Structure formats: C-alpha cells, structure tokens
C-alpha cells in the first residue's frame, strides 16, 4: 500500500472484517445515502467497490450498476494510477457527463489518489465508501467507519478461515 517511510504491511494494524460485519456496514452506509439521493446509477470502483456497490444498489433499489477500473495496487505496493476501464457512455449520460445523480462506491478510501482521479472524471457524483482513512477522508462525501492510516483492512473476500494463535503467543 505504501512506500518509503510508510509502514510495511507487516507493521500495520490488522483490521479483519467478517462478511456479517461488512454487510451491516454497507447497510448502514445505505441508510445514510438514502437521505442524500435519489441516484440514477451506482458506479463501483473495481475491484474493491464491487461487493459494497451490489449491496448498496439492492438496498436503494437501483438497477443500473456500472464500473470504473482504476488500478493502483500491485499486491501490497501502491503505484501509479491508470484508468483501465471508464464508465459507459450511457452511464455518463445519466449523470449529464459530470456525474450528477451518480453514486460512486468503493470499499475504502486510503490516500485519496484513486478518489481524486475518479472525482476528476465525475466531479458532481456522490462518492461513498464503507471505510475511510484520514488522508483520503476529505474526498469522500459519505462513509461509515474511519480507521487510522496505519490500519490494514482484511476484507472477507481476501481472507480464508484459518487457525489464529492467541495474542499471548505474539499474534498480531
């Protein structure tokens, strides 16, 4: 995720999120978004935004879901951003070309680099994330849980069930 003086993955605070907790957090996000809408469509930032976008779209009753693919992570290192796939012309037209009435959803805003790039493409869209870190938080319109910048979130789709040693044995 980071480079240089930033903490390595091993030095970060682990924050495991279960499927149940993630679903509850997405529903809480939707509850907040309900007061902000209405929205014409959901735009998921792939890949992390796919699952929360599906939950949010269901809860808001939205059927139009599009994706924007911005790549910044290679395993545990954060690199240069690239838009690998933009929103469709149909979705962009729903937002008048500026994103008005579109809801951008991602799992997390970290440094804000991805959010800035998407904001540049859809400046009038509403940007929502489930989790937010301090550096990226100013870019997000709506989020549920703030975590510290040195936190590494383990999302349920990135983890498997395995034995965890007790904390007294030096487990993180």
Curated annotation (Swiss-Prot):
HAMAP family: XGPRT. The lineage of its organism: Bacteria, Pseudomonadati, Pseudomonadota, Alphaproteobacteria, Hyphomicrobiales. Mg(2+) binds at residue 107. This is Xanthine-guanine phosphoribosyltransferase. Purine salvage pathway enzyme that catalyzes the transfer of the ribosyl-5-phosphate group from 5-phospho-alpha-D-ribose 1-diphosphate (PRPP) to the N9 position of the 6-oxopurines guanine and xanthine to form the corresponding ribonucleotides GMP (guanosine 5'-monophosphate) and XMP (xanthosine 5'-monophosphate), with the release of PPi. To a lesser extent, also acts on hypoxanthine. One of its GO terms (molecular function) is xanthine phosphoribosyltransferase activity. One of its GO terms (cellular component) is plasma membrane. Homotetramer. Its main location: membrane.
């Amino acid at each position: 995720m980071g480079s240089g003086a930033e903490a390595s993955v091993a030095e970060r605070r682990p924050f495991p999120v279960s499927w149940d907790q993630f679903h509850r957090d997405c529903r809480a996000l939707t509850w907040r978004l309900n007061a902000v809408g209405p929205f014409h469509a959901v735009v998921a930032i792939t890949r992390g935004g796919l699952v929360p976008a599906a939950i949010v779209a269901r809860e808001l009753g939205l059927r139009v879901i599009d994706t924007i693919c911005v790549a910044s992570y290679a395993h545990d290192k954060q690199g240069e951003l690239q838009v690998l796939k933009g929103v469709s012309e149909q979705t962009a037209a729903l937002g008048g070309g500026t994103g008005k009435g579109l809801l951008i959803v991602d799992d997390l805003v970290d440094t804000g680099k991805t959010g800035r790039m998407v904001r540049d493409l859809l400046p009038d869209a509403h940007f929502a994330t489930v989790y937010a870190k301090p550096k990226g938080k100013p870019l997000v319109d709506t989020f549920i849980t703030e975590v510290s910048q040195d936190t590494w979130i383990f999302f349920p789709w990135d983890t498997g069930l395995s034995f965890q040693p007790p904390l007294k044995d030096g487990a993180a």
